[in-house]
Amino acid sequence: MKTGIIIPCYNEEKRLNTKAFVSFIQEHSEYHLCFVNDGSKDNTLEVLYDMKAQAPQAISIVDVKKNSGKATAVRAGARFLFSMPEIAHIGFMDADLSTDFRDFKDLVKTLKRENKLVVFGSRNAQGSGAIERNFMRNVFSKFVKQFILLILGLPIRDTQCGAKVFSRSIVPVVYEEAFVSRWLFDVEIFLRLKKFMGAANVMSNITEQPLMRWVHVEDSKLGMRDAIEIPGRLAHIWFNYNVINTTDRTLATAEANFTLVSSEDNIAIAA
């Protein structure tokens, strides 16, 4: 059984470390890479196909024709990987490799060893090693974190780290429905887990694991306007999950509605 890794990409032509990705997948047959092109306007798609040509059986490409945000890209990748019966675990990581492969493999090892449903990286948990981040970004992150803690009501230090891995069984619950937010979908992931498992049980089924290394790479896709709007967007998420979306969904319902991407989604797949 394999672990599928989703790598969402938007205008990553000049930032993708193609050599690192190809080397990793050629050396790790127990993994499968799923790159999701989120309507890039540069030559990202061509770069992805060049990588696939070097490892055609171990790399897949999901091409979202219109830029729709990281949430949609990750969800599209999850739906595709779930259709592959040999995939036992599905995770995602950032295209800039701000979290490296060593840390991601450690997340997978913990998921298997502790039989958890979700294991996710943390840049804030005690024990983290070489974490590099500029001062203003660090201050703003702490500010946003307080809003998120209020919304979740769970003792999670870092919801927004771009490295998470899920047991196959929980994937339909997390990714069945489209996310409300384009970028803050990590918060929605934990809200969905909390609603499905209950506040009393969710923390025993998930693990927050310190990263040994995480580096903020410049040229972020989130601008100043996005940052200013974050508190309002978080409030919008809270309203949707606590006032509007109050329906309890079972695992059977989620699995029944969790279908492979189709032509109606304006998505092309190179398996």
Regions found by a protein language model. Name each.
Residues 64-80, 89, 101-183, 217-220:
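Acceptor/aglycone-binding surface of glycosyltransferases and processive sugar-polymer synthases
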Residues 14-18, 42-51:
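Acidic helix N-cap motif at the loop->helix transition within catalytic regions
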Residues 37-46, 97:
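A conserved acidic beta->alpha catalytic loop
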Residues 11-26:
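Short, well-formed alpha-helical segments that are part of the catalytic scaffolds
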